[in-house]
C-alpha cells in the first residue's frame, strides 16, 4: 500500500509553525527596553495602523489603496526574520553593501519559507511575502511600520526610558518627510491618545 510519503508527497508542512515562532523574535535588540516587543505583536500593530492609513487615504483624500493587500503586506512583512533574526537597524543600514547583502538574505529566507507551504497554496501567499515595493499599498504599510516603531518609543518614554528619545525624533522626522496626508492625519487625530493612561482614555 502506498502512502503520501512513498508517492513523494509530504504529510507535514512547516509554514505556519515557522510563523508562530515570530513571538520569540525580539525587536530592538541593542536597546534597553522596559518591556520586550516581539515581531508577532509588532506585525499586528503594523496591520492595524496600515488599515487605518488606507481608510484615511481612501475616505478623506480620494485614494484607491487596496486595504486587504496592504494589511496582508503588514501581516507578512517580518516573516523572513523567523530564519534570519532581527538585525539591528544601525547594522542593517550601515552602508549600501551591507544593506544589499541583507536584502538578498531576506529574499532567500522568504523563498525558503514559502517553500514550506503546499505547492497549491503558494500562489495565494507568496504575493504578500514578496510585496510589490513600488505599490501604493507597500508605501502605506512602510509608513505604518514606522508608526508602530514610533508608538513603541512613546511607550518606552512614558516608562521613563530616555534610551528612546533619539529614535523617537528620528522616526517622527522620517514620517513627516514622506509627505503623505494620511500620515499627518494619523499624527494629529490618533497619536496623542497613545500618550494617555487607561484612566485618561476612559474619561474621554
Predicted features, each with a name:
Residues 1-204:
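Alpha-helical, largely C-terminal catalytic domains
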